[in-house]
């Protein structure tokens, strides 16, 4: 895979319990979401050269990447840190290499991704 560091980082992210709490009155809705931002994302943002990093009270973490050229347009990247109110403990991500179009069992097999139910899976034949 071309971006191995990216894949490794993503696989680390999905193992973190950032499950939403629909009954919470706070933003973010759980302490684990705040911890993810401050203890995982913040150091990684510093490591790739972002500056002026801040954690905002509404759950956003922001940083600045200085331009390397003059008079260029600015760009922003956003992503949310919470995940659906679904099991988020003991996540064991799978990497399906060279997808063959078959049903993909998830975890213990109670749930699956079936191309009959999810026809978009067919777009990924032969991909990782």
Q: Residue locations for each model-derived region?
A:
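A non-catalytic alpha/beta surface segment that caps or lines the substrate-entry region
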Residues: 25-72, 76-82, 89-99
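Extended aliphatic helical segments
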Residues: 14-16, 48, 62, 95, ...
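Conserved active-site and cofactor/substrate-binding residues in soluble primary-metabolism enzymes
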Residues: 1, 5-8, 35-36, 72
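N-terminal capping segment at the start of a domain
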Residues: 3-31
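Active-site metal-coordination/substrate-binding segment of hydrolases
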Residues: 72-128
């Amino acid at each position: 895979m071309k971006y191995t560091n990216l894949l490794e980082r993503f696989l680390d992210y999905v193992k973190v319990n950032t499950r939403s709490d629909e009954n919470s009155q706070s933003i973010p809705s759980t302490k684990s979401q705040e911890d993810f931002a401050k203890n995982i994302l913040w150091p990684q943002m510093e490591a790739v050269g972002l500056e002026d990093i801040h954690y905002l009270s509404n759950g956003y973490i922001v940083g600045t990447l200085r331009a390397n050229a003059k008079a260029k347009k600015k760009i922003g990247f956003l992503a949310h840190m919470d995940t659906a109110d679904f099991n988020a403990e003991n996540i064991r991500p799978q990497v399906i290499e060279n997808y063959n179009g078959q049903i993909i069992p998830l975890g213990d097999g109670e749930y699956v991704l079936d191309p009959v139910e999810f026809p978009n899976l067919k777009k990924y034949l032969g991909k990782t």
